[in-house]
C-alpha cells in the first residue's frame, strides 16, 4: 500500500465528495487523524476543500497528513506553488469554493476552469493575457463588479493607463454582499491597487474621453 486518501461521500452523496462553501474547509482532517492513528506507518493524504495554503501547512506540521491535495486551489491559481516558493503568498488568487465551472462530474465534459480565473484550463488556446503592450492607451472601465475589477487589473498589468468608475460607494458588486465571494473581491481590489488602477466611486463621470471603454 503506497498511501491512503481520506474521503467522504459516494455516488449517492456526491455533494460530500467535493462540497462547496457550505461545508467547512479541510473537512476530512478528522478522517486523516483516525487513519493516521490506525496505520501510523502508511502515508496519508489530506483531501477535501483545502484551499488555503496556511491550513495545508498547518496540517502537515501538526502531523495530520504527509501530503495535501489542493486541486481547486490550483485551478483558481495555477501558479500557487511557484508563488509560495517565491515568498509571494499574498498574490495567490483565492478559491471561493463556488463549484460553478470546476466540476468534473458533468456528462457534457466542459472545460474545467474557474469563475475567478477565467484563463485557467485554457492556457493552450488563449493568447497571453498579461503580455505587455507596446502602446499604452487610456482605458476607462465602467462598473466595479468582479468583471470590471478583473478587466481593469489585467489592462493595468499589461501597461495601460486605467481608470475605473463605480456608481456606488462599494466595489465588488453582488459578490461583495455574498460572504463566500468576499475574498475574491478583496484580492481583485488589491490587484488593481498594486497595478496602479485609478478608482473613483460614487460617480458616473466618464470624462475625459478615453481611448477605450470597457462596460
Give residue spans per PLM region:
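Flavin-dependent oxidoreductase catalytic cores
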Residues: 1-142, 146, 150-162, 170
Amino acid at each position: 500500500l503506497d498511501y491512503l486518501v481520506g474521503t467522504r461521500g459516494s455516488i449517492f452523496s456526491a455533494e460530500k465528495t467535493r462540497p462547496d462553501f457550505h461545508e467547512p474547509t479541510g473537512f476530512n482532517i478528522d478522517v486523516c487523524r483516525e487513519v493516521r492513528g490506525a496505520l501510523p506507518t502508511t502515508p496519508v493524504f489530506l483531501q477535501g476543500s483545502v484551499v488555503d495554503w496556511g491550513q495545508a501547512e498547518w496540517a502537515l506540521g501538526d502531523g495530520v497528513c504527509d501530503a495535501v491535495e489542493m486541486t481547486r486551489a490550483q485551478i483558481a491559481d495555477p501558479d500557487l506553488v511557484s508563488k509560495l516558493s517565491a515568498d509571494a503568498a499574498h498574490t495567490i488568487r483565492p478559491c471561493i469554493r463556488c463549484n460553478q465551472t470546476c466540476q468534473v462530474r458533468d456528462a457534457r465534459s466542459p472545460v474545467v476552469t474557474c469563475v475567478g480565473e477565467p484563463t485557467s484550463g485554457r492556457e493552450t488556446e488563449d493568447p497571453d493575457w498579461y503580455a505587455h503592450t507596446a502602446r499604452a492607451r487610456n482605458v476607462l472601465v465602467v462598473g466595479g463588479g468582479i468583471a470590471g475589477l478583473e478587466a481593469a487589473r489585467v489592462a493595468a498589468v499589461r501597461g495601460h493607463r486605467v481608470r475605473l468608475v463605480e456608481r456606488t460607494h462599494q466595489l465588488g458588486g453582488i459578490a461583495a454582499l455574498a460572504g463566500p465571494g468576499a475574498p475574491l473581491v478583496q484580492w481583485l481590489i488589491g490587484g488593481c491597487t498594486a497595478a496602479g488602477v485609478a478608482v473613483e466611486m460614487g460617480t458616473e463621470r466618464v470624462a475625459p474621453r478615453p481611448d477605450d471603454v470597457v462596460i
